[in-house]
């Protein structure tokens, strides 16, 4: 049905937090504001319920553990054709963190866990922060205690913060930890790659059979697969299968959805005295080894993760052609990218009498280049060492522009 606009958000019985602060907490149920143009003030029931929870979270972040919503109402104003929302809150008292003890930890010391928790005795109670430092569900690679264990093989670990004592305005906590056995990756499979060959994906996997389970490596693998550009990054789904705490093993099945990786560029316009046309083709999952396999043309040989680009740009006074090729795993065993390209451009002088290109007067440039880029391991594998070699050949044919003292000749350059 019709999404109604929100005329006003009112809060009742709030003395510890201002209306402005509480309105800021509700992200998707904003009241009408002529200044705000990027966020619509429309009422959506599901988002409204979520925003009510965010009001309580805002209180918990400021120490008000017992804050709750006593009642809320949504009324319709026929004259303004809009809704008015009233939220009645009970704030409660402000609390502070007391003693925080760790129980069940043998792998990490209390001091090490305290540094990760980042909460100290005497600080204002913050239930949202405490929950995130135990397990931040909004960030899979967050620096929290759960990830600390799971990045070190403890897939079956369980961490809970339990209130054990409340005295006046102080709350004591126990962080109860069940570490469990170390888990190892067992069988690793990939499904859904209808076009891309298995080896292109498996060489990017950081979760290898027999190695200690690591959530960090699992998250990194998802990111690496997404960066290939051949699959929908939002649809990458690692399924945990045959999880066996007794044997300490887990199978991972990566479910993928292929997406189009080729691109076509077609542009046209007027400039520099005439029409300029551009045609570009880019094939980002090419297979050079199948170029002579007629059965692989569907319509082109694809699936090996190589990139081929062709580009043509032309007008009355110039022409440019270029072809490039890159292989991200040169030799197939290590992440060493090989790249090569060739380009040729031809530019004609303008005949000022006829205002046309003089095809007898040209400046030609041919460029060849090759390069290697190796992924390093020190200081980490985000660093790349690259080197390249290029060759240019210049050819002047009756090209007298006044910039040179000559109009004919050739030159070569290596770099």
Please give the residue ranges for each predicted region.
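Interaction-mediating elements
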Residues: 1-228, 233, 242-249, 256, ...
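Gram-negative/organellar outer-membrane beta-barrel architecture
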Residues: 5-6, 19-20, 24-36, 41, ...
């Amino acid at each position: 049905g019709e999404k109604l606009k929100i005329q006003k958000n009112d809060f009742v019985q709030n003395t510890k937090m201002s209306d402005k602060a509480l309105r800021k907490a509700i992200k998707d149920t904003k009241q009408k504001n002529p200044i705000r143009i990027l966020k619509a003030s429309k009422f959506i029931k599901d988002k409204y319920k979520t925003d009510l929870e965010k009001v309580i979270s805002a209180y918990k972040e400021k120490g008000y553990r017992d804050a709750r919503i006593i009642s809320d109402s949504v009324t319709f104003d026929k004259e303004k054709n809009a809704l008015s929302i009233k939220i009645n809150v009970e704030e409660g008292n402000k609390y502070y963190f007391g003693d925080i003890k760790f129980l069940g930890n043998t792998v990490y010391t209390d001091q090490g866990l305290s540094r990760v928790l980042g909460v100290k005795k005497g600080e204002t109670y913050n239930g949202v922060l405490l929950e995130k430092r135990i397990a931040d569900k909004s960030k899979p690679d967050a620096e929290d205690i759960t990830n600390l264990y799971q990045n070190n093989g403890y897939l079956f670990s369980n961490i809970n913060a339990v209130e054990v004592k409340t005295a006046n305005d102080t709350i004591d906590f126990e962080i109860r930890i069940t570490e469990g056995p170390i888990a190892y990756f067992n069988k690793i499979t990939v499904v859904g790659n209808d076009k891309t060959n298995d080896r292109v994906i498996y060489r990017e996997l950081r979760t290898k059979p027999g190695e200690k389970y690591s959530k960090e490596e699992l998250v990194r693998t998802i990111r690496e697969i997404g960066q290939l550009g051949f699959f929908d990054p939002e649809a990458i789904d690692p399924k945990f299968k045959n999880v066996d705490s007794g044997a300490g093993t887990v199978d991972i099945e990566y479910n993928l959805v292929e997406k189009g990786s080729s691109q076509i560029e077609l542009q046209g316009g007027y400039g520099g005295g005439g029409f300029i046309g551009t045609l570009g083709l880019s094939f980002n999952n090419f297979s050079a080894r199948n170029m002579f396999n007629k059965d692989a043309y569907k319509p082109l040989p694809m699936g090996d993760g190589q990139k081929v680009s062709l580009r043509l740009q032309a007008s009355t006074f110039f022409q440019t052609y270029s072809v490039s090729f890159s292989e991200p795993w040169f030799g197939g065993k290590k992440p060493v990218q090989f790249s090569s390209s060739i380009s040729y451009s031809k530019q004609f002088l303008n005949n000022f009498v006829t205002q046309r290109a003089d095809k007898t007067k040209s400046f030609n440039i041919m460029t060849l280049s090759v390069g290697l880029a190796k992924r390093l391991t020190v200081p980490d594998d985000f660093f790349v060492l690259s080197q390249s070699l290029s060759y240019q050949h210049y050819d002047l044919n009756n090209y007298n522009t006044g910039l040179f003292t000559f109009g004919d000749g050739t030159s070569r350059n290596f770099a």
